[in-house]
A protein has these predicted regions:
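Glycine-/acidic-rich phosphate or pyrophosphate-binding loops and their flanking alpha/beta elements
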Residues: 10-14, 236-259, 272
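Generic long, charged, amphipathic alpha-helical segments
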Residues: 271-304
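N-terminal glycine-rich anion-binding loops that anchor highly charged ligand groups
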Residues: 7-44
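Structural signature of the thiamine diphosphate
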Residues: 140-197, 350-358
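Conformationally flexible catalytic loops at phosphate/diphosphate-handling active centers
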Residues: 166-251
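Thiamine diphosphate
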Residues: 37-131, 141-163
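Peripheral docking tails and interdomain loops at the edges
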Residues: 315-359
Length: 359
């Protein structure tokens, strides 16, 4: 496909094509519905014959994330993708990568749980993604696409943020976004970085370069408590910087809104239709969509609390993001949650009824 060509594809396919085009060096993954098309598309496209990108199906999600760890140590642009149960298996590796300050991209195309659950869409991985699902005090940078176009656009953005802050980044997409087909313009081809460029950009990397006075050693282990605290404080300082600089969100019809919906991913798309219906009935509703879930747009939610009569957290789960909204609002206005479970996506009319009932 030529640059700027409009094509029709699934969200998962857009992830794969964007990875090839944005200079990704390696993908290590394992098939699981509803994200298997990422690996399948890479296998069909055979980027190892064109860009030199490595594509490998590992024997498990545990192996996949540890391969990503190894690739990230060398300063390469590496990634994996999975769905909810598979992401659970990766949590140890993600904690290790955050502790070692390694940049990489993880894609989670969420399905319903708990346990094996269902293959239908869900947003129930919010806590796991945004609060650090593994052990220790760490965060991933979490991006939440709401369209196939954003699935494509967020691949390069995720890598840029991951390398800027030396931190794993996650694209958190629900199964509906992964499986839906839409028009998309793929990013232009970006060549993979040369070894010299990697050495310049990533002086911390274990590139195998000879002649260093002090070889790079990457680890998250430190047995001296005082030194471990210093490391933690440095990482927390980095998180504060991310919180100050990387909050991204979309506002929709909030100028005159009396009620606000906060939603991400496919739930935000539903919210826009619900707002159209509500406004046709004389109920002034607007939308705040977090584009990046962590860091969360706390200040923007706080501003909402001074403008509206109530806030509805629309999620395809039992209520997770609503906790961050309530923390931000500090009891200044009522905050309610509405969502569906078991892989069922809320209907726009249901959302309007919830606004009428809850407020």
């Amino acid at each position: 496909m030529a640059d700027q060509e409009i094509t029709l594809m699934k969200g998962n396919e857009a992830i794969a094509h964007a990875a090839i085009r944005c200079g990704c060096d390696g993908y290590f993954g394992y098939p699981i519905t509803p994200q298997s098309e990422v690996l399948e598309t890479l296998a069909v496209e055979k980027p190892w014959e064109t860009t030199g990108m490595v594509v490998l199906q590992a024997e498990s999600e545990v192996s996949s994330i540890n391969m990503v760890y190894g690739g990230a140590c060398t300063g390469k642009r590496v990634m994996t993708s999975s769905s909810s149960p598979g992401i659970s298996l990766m949590q140890e590796g993600l904690s290790y990568m955050a502790g070692a300050e390694l940049p990489a991209l993880i894609v989670d195309v969420m399905r319903g749980g708990p346990g094996l659950g269902t293959i239908q869409p869900s947003q129930a991985d919010y806590f796991q993604a945004c609060k650090g699902g593994g052990h220790g005090d760490y965060h991933l940078i979490v991006l939440a696409p709401a369209s196939v176009q954003e699935m494509a656009d967020f691949v390069d953005l995720s890598f840029e943020l991951a390398f800027r802050y030396r931190n794993p980044a996650m694209i958190l997409a629900d199964g509906a976004i992964g499986q839906m087909m839409e028009k998309v313009v793929l990013p232009p081809f970006k060549p993979r970085r040369t070894e010299e460029e990697i050495i310049k950009e990533c002086p911390w990397a274990t590139t195998g370069r000879m002649g260093r006075k002090h070889p790079n050693i990457i680890t998250s282990l430190e047995l001296r408590s005082e030194e471990m605290e210093v490391i933690n404080l440095r990482i927390q300082k980095k998180y504060k910087e991310i919180e100050e600089k990387e909050v991204r969100f979309e506002e929709y019809l909030l100028d005159d809104a009396e009620y606000a919906i906060v939603a991400f991913g496919s739930a935000a798309r539903i919210a826009k239709k619900s707002i159209e219906i509500a406004r046709s009935q004389g109920i002034k509703v607007g939308l705040l969509r977090p584009i990046i879930l962590w860091p969360f747009p706390t200040k923007e939610v706080q501003k909402l609390a001074g403008k509206v009569k109530g806030i509805l957290s629309l999620e395809i789960n039992a209520g997770q993001m609503v906790e961050d909204i309530r923390l931000a609002v500090e009891g200044k206005v009522p905050v309610q949650h509405f969502g569906r479970l078991g892989g069922i996506i809320p209907d726009p009319d249901e959302v309007v009824d919830a606004i009428k009932r809850l407020f």
